[in-house]
């Protein structure tokens, strides 16, 4: 029989489900984690622990609960909180905690700067949306302005799901 794993990384927990080819649930697991608030208006997760570590833990739990062999897993679907901002180095390793979606409001000054430089109407025309605390662009500008040493080392900006789907050497195999 073939199986599919679904994983959802949420603000306060990670959940996994294992379903067989006819859609029956074989196993479910979850793992709580905390949203870090290092300063008022900031919201973060520890990517290696809260995203990657929880992903590994819940997927291993459902495999053990079900006795399904990893080679019988034919599909993997991930959803996660977002949009988040995670700067990584050229090896794919996180350079800081992941900055969460709209609950993190640290980039309000950068939103104002971008609106003044580019113009609200031009941003709306290009993006189809206004800039808000949900937007990643202002958070990247915040990173450049407030953590230049991290920004210089940044090779890519990932989201939480991108961290799961990219496979730097320590993450080569999950199952």
Question: Where in the sequence are the language-model features?
Answer:
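Short, glycine/acidic-enriched loop or turn micro-motifs at the edges of active sites
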Residues: 11, 107, 172
């Amino acid at each position: 029989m073939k199986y599919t794993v679904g994983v959802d990384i949420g603000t306060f927990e990670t959940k996994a489900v294992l379903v067989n080819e006819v859609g029956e649930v074989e196993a479910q697991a979850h793992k709580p984690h905390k949203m870090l608030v290092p300063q008022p208006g900031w919201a973060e997760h520890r990517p290696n622990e809260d995203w990657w570590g929880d992903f590994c833990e819940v997927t291993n739990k459902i495999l053990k609960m079900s006795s399904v062999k990893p080679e019988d897993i034919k599909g993997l679907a991930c959803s996660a909180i977002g949009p988040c901002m995670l700067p990584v180095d050229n090896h794919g390793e996180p350079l800081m905690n992941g900055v969460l979606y709209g609950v993190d409001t640290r980039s309000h000054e950068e939103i104002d700067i971008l609106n003044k430089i580019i113009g609200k109407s031009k941003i709306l025309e290009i993006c189809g949306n206004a800039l808000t605390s949900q937007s990643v662009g202002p958070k990247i500008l915040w990173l450049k302005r407030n953590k230049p040493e991290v920004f210089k080392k940044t090779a890519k900006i990932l989201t939480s799901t991108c961290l799961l789907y990219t496979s730097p050497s320590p993450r080569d195999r999950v199952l």
